[in-house]
From Swiss-Prot:
Pathway: Metabolic intermediate biosynthesis; acetyl-CoA biosynthesis; acetyl-CoA from acetate: step 2/2. Keywords: Acyltransferase, Cytoplasm, Transferase. GO terms for biological process: acetyl-CoA biosynthetic process. It is found in: Cytoplasm. One of its GO terms (cellular component) is cytoplasm. Its EC number is 2.3.1.8. It catalyses: acetyl-CoA + phosphate = acetyl phosphate + CoA. InterPro entries: P_Ac_Bu_trans (IPR012147), P_AcTrfase (IPR004614), P_AcTrfase_dom1 (IPR042113), P_AcTrfase_dom2 (IPR042112), Phos_Acetyltrans/Butyryltrans (IPR050500), PTA_PTB (IPR002505). Transmembrane segments: none annotated. PANTHER family: PHOSPHATE ACETYLTRANSFERASE. This is Phosphate acetyltransferase. It is an enzyme of class 2 (transferase).
Length: 323
C-alpha cells in the first residue's frame, strides 16, 4: 500500500496543486493538512474562521505554515462567487439564496474549485456523503458524455491492486450506467498505473444463466465495447471466472480476460458495497476510497470514521485526479 501512495505522492509533488478542505475545525483534517503542507506535497486551503482554526491547531501542537484559511463570512471575492453560483444554477437560485448557500463550507469550497481557485475538494469527515456530493453535482457537474458520477475503491494488499466499482453511489445502474462506470473505472485505474482489464460481474458467465439481470450486464458489455473498443473488457462473468485463470479456461475460454481481471464492475450498489467489504474484512485488503469519478473537477468524500492518514491519502488521490 505504501508503494501506491508513494507513487501518487511523487506524481503530485511540486505540481502546485491546491486542494480545499471545508471542515477546518476537524482535528483529523488539521493534522493531515499540516503534514501535507509541511511535506510540500500540495497547497491546502482550509475553510472556516481563522482565529478558531489557528487556536485549534495550537491546541493540537500543529503548525499551519503554508496553509491558506478562507472564511466565507469575510472572503473578499464572495460577490464574484455569488454571481457565478446564480449563473451556474440557471434560474434555480436567487442572489439571496446563493449568498446563504455559500456560507455553507461545502458549497463555498465547491465554488472555489469551480472558479479555478482550487483544483479539488476533500470533505466528509464530519458531513454526510450527500452534503459533500450534492454541491459537486449542482455546480461542478459531470463531464461531457458522462451522465452520472460513480464511486470506486482501490483494493490493495501488498503488491496486489484492484479497482472495484460502483461501491458508493448508484443503487441500481442500468446497462448504459454500467458501461459508463466501466469506462470511467478503467480511466481511474490508469491514473494509478494499473493497466485496466475490466470484468463486468454477474451471477452468470457468458450466458450460463438467463434473466433480466444477466441480460443487463451482457448489454452493458456490448455498449462499453462500442464506446471504448480499445479497452480490454468483457463479461458477463461470475467472479471466479474473472479472477481465476483455471476457472476462466473452463467457463470462458474465448474471453480476452482469461481470469486476469483487475477492474471489477458490480451489477448493483448492493453487490459492490458487500463485495468490497468482504475483500476488506476477510481478505485483509485495504480499501482506498470511495474515489468519485465522472465529475468535471475532482471532489472526494471521506468516511466519517476516517483518521488523519485517510485524509492525507485521499488528498493525494484528489490531487492526482486534478493533474
Amino acid at each position: 500500500m505504501a508503494d501506491l501512495f508513494s507513487t501518487v505522492q511523487e506524481k503530485v509533488a511540486g505540481k502546485d496543486v491546491k486542494i480545499v478542505f471545508p471542515e477546518g475545525l476537524d482535528e483529523r483534517i488539521l493534522e493531515a493538512v499540516s503534514k501535507l503542507a509541511g511535506n510540500k506535497v500540495l497547497n491546502p486551503i482550509v475553510i472556516g474562521n481563522e482565529n478558531e482554526i489557528q487556536a485549534k491547531a495550537k491546541e493540537l501542537n500543529l503548525t499551519l505554515g503554508g496553509v491558506k484559511i478562507y472564511d466565507p463570512h469575510t472572503y473578499e471575492g464572495m460577490e464574484d462567487l455569488v454571481q457565478a453560483f446564480v449563473e451556474r444554477r440557471k434560474g434555480k437560485a436567487t442572489e439571496e439564496q446563493a449568498r446563504k448557500a455559500l456560507l455553507d463550507e461545502n458549497y463555498f469550497g465547491t465554488m472555489l474549485v469551480y472558479k479555478g481557485l482550487a483544483d479539488g475538494l476533500v470533505s466528509g469527515a464530519a458531513h454526510s456523503t450527500a452534503d459533500t456530493v450534492r454541491p459537486a453535482l449542482q455546480i461542478i457537474k459531470t463531464k461531457e458524455g458522462v451522465k452520472k458520477t460513480s464511486g470506486v475503491f482501490i483494493m490493495a494488499r501488498g503488491e496486489e491492486q484492484y479497482v472495484f466499482a460502483d461501491c458508493a453511489i448508484n443503487i441500481a445502474p442500468d446497462s448504459q450506467d454500467l458501461a459508463e462506470i466501466a469506462i470511467e473505472s478503467a480511466n481511474t485505474a490508469k491514473m494509478f498505473d494499473i493497466e485496466p482489464r475490466v470484468a463486468m460481474l454477474s451471477f452468470s458467465t457468458k450466458g450460463s444463466a438467463k434473466s433480466d439481470e444477466t441480460e443487463k450486464v451482457a448489454d452493458a458489455v456490448k455498449i462499453a465495447k462500442e464506446k471504448a473498443p480499445e479497452l480490454t473488457l468483457d463479461g458477463e462473468f461470475q467472479f471466479d471466472a474473472a479472477f481465476v485463470p483455471s476457472v476462466a479456461e473452463k467457463k470462458a475460454p474465448d474471453s480476452e480476460i482469461k481470469g486476469d481481471a483487475n477492474v471489477f464492475v458490480f451489477p448493483s450498489l448492493e453487490a459492490g458495497n458487500i463485495g468490497y467489504k468482504i475483500a476488506q474484512r476477510l481478505g485483509n485488503f485495504e480499501a482506498v476510497g470511495p474515489i468519485l469519478q465522472g465529475l468535471n473537477m475532482p471532489v472526494n468524500d471521506l468516511s466519517r470514521g476516517c483518521n488523519a492518514e485517510d485524509v492525507y491519502n485521499l488528498a493525494l488521490i484528489t490531487a492526482a485526479q486534478a493533474l
